[in-house]
Amino acid sequence: MGITSDSIANLLTRIRNALMAEHLYIDIEHSKMLEAIVRILKQHGFVAHFLVKEENRKRLMRVFLRYGEDRRPVIHALKRVSKPSRRVYVSAAKIPYVFGNMGIAVLSTPQGVLEGSEARAKNVGGELLCLVW
């Protein structure tokens, strides 16, 4: 796996492509930030589960994707908001409601990576990483 400057965009793109190809899982290089994002996706039912494994002295994360009974992906869209070239920060009051509360916003806050409603409840803002619905 090559080095990318935006590992979050890489994660979202790999998930998007794997869902279109109806793959069961993806493998991606592990980082604490990516694990926190995938953990939030799992808590909200967007991915089935994930595990972290070490292979050839590299830590990899295997993310198992989730599909409905009709083999349609549970995730309809993933959108990267804040990018290395253009950071987007929001206050707690400006955290977006995604797709009529059917989706989630993922933020990097001083209290760690949080989902939008959790950050709103804690009255904390931060960098708006991505939107998922």
UniProtKB/Swiss-Prot annotation:
GO terms for cellular component: ribonucleoprotein complex; ribosome. Coiled coil: none annotated. One of its GO terms (molecular function) is rRNA binding. Keywords: Ribonucleoprotein, Ribosomal protein, RNA-binding, rRNA-binding. One of its GO terms (biological process) is translation. InterPro entries: Ribosomal_uS8, Ribosomal_uS8_CS, Ribosomal_uS8_sf. SUPFAM superfamilies: Ribosomal protein S8. It holds the Pfam family Ribosomal_S8. PROSITE patterns: RIBOSOMAL_S8. NCBIfam families: PRK00136.1 (NF001109). HAMAP family: Ribosomal_uS8_B. Belongs to the universal ribosomal protein uS8 family. Part of the 30S ribosomal subunit. Contacts proteins S5 and S12. PANTHER family: 40S RIBOSOMAL PROTEIN S15A. One of the primary rRNA binding proteins, it binds directly to 16S rRNA central domain where it helps coordinate assembly of the platform of the 30S subunit. This is Small ribosomal subunit protein uS8. It comes from Chlamydia muridarum (strain MoPn / Nigg).
